[in-house]
A protein has these predicted regions:
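Alpha-helical, coiled-coil/dimerization segments enriched in small aliphatic residues
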Residues: 94-97, 217-245
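Extracytoplasmic ligand-binding site segments that recognize negatively charged/polar headgroups
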Residues: 137, 152-166, 201-224, 269
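Short helix-initiation/N-cap motifs at beta->coil->alpha
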Residues: 54-56, 106-118, 240-250
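A short, structured surface patch at a secondary-structure boundary
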Residues: 67-123, 127-132, 233-236
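Flexible loop/hinge segments that line or gate small-molecule binding clefts
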Residues: 95-102, 134-166, 170
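Structured C-terminal subdomain patch of bacterial secreted/periplasmic proteins
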Residues: 161-162, 166-169, 178, 182, ...
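Bacterial Sec-exported substrate-binding components of ABC uptake systems
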Residues: 2-76, 175-207, 257, 316-329
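Short helices/loops that flank or line small-molecule/ion binding pockets
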Residues: 115-125, 140, 144-145, 247-257
């Protein structure tokens, strides 16, 4: 969800930038849009580690990394899930400034647009972890200096599995990574299997509101669409053939008349923000009070915590199967 949000809404007001930083997770990487493969390439030596990152670039390490700079909160969550935080020597400024839960005790090594080159080179990290989207010139300079960079670029839940596996390879935590993936797959399949047999007429139409003016939503090839579909809903924007994070007219919204509206808390502090929007007054979701506000992080960050987002979407879309909606941080 991530690089697409950056390209679509970076010029929109500060809150959308916050969504981008969460959905794009403060990356330090290239603006290239090569498709994600995440393949773990067979090693050519006993200690050599070869990976293909989210931009399709090969990354080679002589041994598991012991000093890592992390400029993507999603990657930091994965590292925490692998019990490998002792390998992290620094993170991004945004996470420090916004007191992210995992940021305590760490120094910032750069912001979203500009990296602290002097500080980074002095730290001599074994590798930098980030996401596609920003600081291209700085990243090239670091590459020229021989600093390894692994770019995370996962847009679907299935791609999160490979990111976890690759983080395990980088950290020498292969077993822990496989166990984390197995547990995550089990939880995801536990939800998706319960709605897999539903006919189309039993799947509620869902609209995810990314931004209100202009009205923006999530289409194909986004985490949000993946969550909606795996939770047994129909994303009306994806159904219209739109990809990424497009603008969506109020006329089209009224025409498609979604049964459910979901929005991030960074856009709507509570459901009244949406329910009281006069443009939505005739929409089924508003009339029937099927409007839900979800926290940003577990619905947009490509880590094992995405299961919390999927659970909330499932409860919002099919409470008769998954129980009453409950916010999960």
């Amino acid at each position: 969800m991530e690089k697409g949000i950056l390209k679509s809404v970076i010029a929109v007001a500060a809150i959308i930038t916050s969504i981008i930083l969460i959905t794009l997770t403060l990356s330090v990487c290239s603006n290239n849009s090569a498709s994600f493969t995440g393949d773990v390439v067979a090693t050519t030596a006993a200690t050599e580690i070869k990976l293909t990152d989210g931009l399709g670039k090969e990354v080679v390490l002589d041994k598991p990394a012991e000093k890592i700079l992390v400029f993507a909160p999603s990657a930091l969550e994965i590292i925490d899930g692998l019990n490998a935080m002792d390998a992290v020597i620094g993170i991004d400024n945004w996470s420090v400034d916004n007191k992210e839960p995992l940021a305590e005790g760490f120094e910032g090594f750069g912001d979203f647009q500009t990296l602290n080159m002097e500080k980074i080179t002095a730290a001599a990290p074994d590798i930098i972890i980030g996401l596609a989207g920003c600081a291209e010139a700085d990243i090239q300079k670091l590459t020229d200096l021989g600093i390894k960079i692994y770019v995370v670029d996962a847009n679907m839940i299935d791609e999160v599995y490979m990111e976890i596996i690759n983080m395990g390879k980088i950290l020498g935590k292969d077993t822990e990574a496989r166990e984390l993936v197995d547990e995550l797959k089990k939880q995801v399949e536990g939800i998706s299997s319960k709605v897999a047999g539903l006919t189309e007429d039993k799947k509620p139409k869902v609209f995810y509101e990314v931004w209100n003016e202009p009205l923006m939503s999530a289409g194909k090839n986004t985490f949000i669409n993946d969550l909606i579909e795996k939770a047994g809903g129909i994303n009306i924007v994806a159904a219209d053939g739109l990809e990424g994070w497009p603008e969506y007219s109020i006329e089209k919204l009224i025409q498609n008349n979604p049964d459910i509206i979901i929005a991030p808390v960074s856009l709507a502090p509570d459901v009244s923000t949406i329910i009281e929007d006069r443009r939505f007054s005739s929409i089924n979701a508003v009339v029937n009070k099927k409007v839900y506000v979800v926290p940003d992080n577990p619905t947009t960050r490509p880590s094992q915590n995405i299961i919390k987002g999927l659970t909330m979407f499932a409860q919002a879309i099919h409470p008769e199967i998954f129980g009453e909606f409950s916010v999960q941080q």
